[in-house]
Design a protein with these regions (language model features):
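Positively charged n-region of N-terminal signal peptides that target proteins for export
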Residues: 1-9
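Hydrophobic alpha-helical segments, principally membrane-spanning helices and signal/leader peptides
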Residues: 1-2, 297, 377
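Ser/Thr/Gly/Pro-rich low-complexity, disordered linker/stalk segments of secreted
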Residues: 29-47, 365-391
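Bacterial lipoprotein signal-peptidase II cleavage site
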Residues: 18-27
Length: 391
């Protein structure tokens, strides 16, 4: 019996040792893993390069125009045609200058790129006026004492290249112009050198670059089609002064978006390149005109006036103003809003108020109609139905 009790005590002891003390419960701790936050990175934005508009032709440029406008006289009588590089002018203005003589003045924003221009003729008071309005350096082939005194009185910078080119011992003077006697005879064979006249002007102390930006009166739009306009594929501009008249015709080329210049029954094409003379913008300005005692016509631009404007095959009546002797022409719609021109070259006819403008639209092309052929119909063949016999 004692042995049994002892055995039970041993077993109890062993069982208690196997259980041992209960370990304290440990709560599982989960460390929050924080994802590293990345700051949003913004790509550096590049400011678009500023764009500028050429004030004479509306072309877009990355730099402003700070040059000097140059102007030159261009003969426009039949004996002087065809022109040489008149098509390179940003603006061509045509007018009667005395009696029945019609001439042009061309305005160039960078005449240094044009090797030859002409033929060039003598200046007139109206050319002097226009050069003053645009602060242009005027080149011409002499002029009467009255015209030259008038140019000096206007304070314009002007050069008589007919005199300068003869100074063969002075390369700068001699390089301003040249005569091409194979081209034309007499007074119609003097041609201005664009690079030559710029170099000579610079040698005379005339600043031709890095000038303050200037307002030349024109505004431009990507699409210069005038509002409240009529279709005008053919425009006949008739300049008149008293009993004298001269007709210019502009034919619209819809594919090119330009008007081609016709006069004296011929299309105007360049003597050297044979390319037609074309314009994106066509303008008629009606201006009060009088005649000085020596026979020169003068225009009174300061009151402003009316006219017409055409672009992209459409034409509309306009008004225009000129605020002073040194102010450019400004153009407006008939309602008085600023008139945007289309980017490109501009032709301006200057006429007394007796001048006229007529225009016509092309007849729309009617597509040829072909007789519809009715296809022959064949009668459908009804298949024979197989007789079914009852089994």
């Amino acid at each position: 019996m004692k042995k049994l009790i002892a055995l039970l005590l041993v077993l109890a002891t062993l069982l208690g040792g196997c259980g041992g003390a209960a370990e304290p419960a440990t709560e599982a701790t989960t460390e929050a893993t924080t994802e590293p936050t990345t700051e949003p990175t913004t790509e550096p934005t590049t400011e678009p390069a500023p764009t500028y508009v050429n004030p004479l032709n509306g072309e877009i440029s990355e730099i402003p125009y700070t040059g000097r406008v140059f102007a030159t006289t261009i003969s426009n009588v039949p004996a002087a045609l065809p022109h040489v590089n008149a098509k390179e002018a940003d603006i061509i203005m045509e007018m009667f200058v005395n009696s029945s003589v019609v001439r042009c003045i061309g305005l160039f924003h960078d005449i240094s790129k044009v090797d030859a221009i002409g033929s060039t003729r003598s200046t007139r008071p109206m050319f002097n006026d226009i050069a003053e309005h645009y602060d242009a350096v005027l080149s011409h082939a002499g002029g009467t004492n009255t015209a030259l005194v008038n140019a000096n009185e206007h304070g314009i910078t002007h050069y008589n290249v007919d005199s300068l080119y003869r100074k063969v011992d002075d390369p700068l003077k001699a390089g301003t112009a040249y005569r091409d006697k194979e081209y034309k005879h007499g007074e119609h064979n003097l041609f201005l050198s664009g690079p030559g006249i710029v170099a000579y002007a610079q040698s005379e102390g005339i600043q031709t670059t890095d000038l303050p930006e200037r307002d030349y009166g024109l505004i431009f739009a990507e699409d210069g089609t005038p509002i409240n306009s009529e279709a005008a594929d053919t425009i006949v501009l008739q300049m008149k002064y008293k009993s004298t008249k001269k007709e210019t015709v502009m034919e619209y080329d819809a594919e090119a978006g330009t008007y081609t210049w016709w006069q004296y029954g011929e299309m105007m094409a360049d003597q050297i390149t044979e390319e037609p003379e074309t314009f994106e913008n066509v303008v008629m300005m009606f201006v009060p005109m009088t005649t000085m005692k020596h026979g020169y016509h003068v225009a009174d631009f300061l009151p402003g006036g009316t006219g017409y404007y055409a672009c992209n095959g459409r034409l509309t009546p306009i008004t225009w103003t000129c605020a002073g002797d040194k102010e450019p022409f400004r153009f407006f719609t008939a309602e008085g809003d600023p008139l945007p021109f289309g980017a490109g070259k501009t032709y301006i006819a200057i006429s007394s108020p007796e001048g006229t403008v007529e225009w016509t639209a092309k007849e729309p092309e009617v597509p040829e109609t072909t007789e519809a052929t009715v296809p022959e119909t064949t009668a459908a063949t009804v298949p024979e139905t197989a007789e079914t016999t009852a089994p």
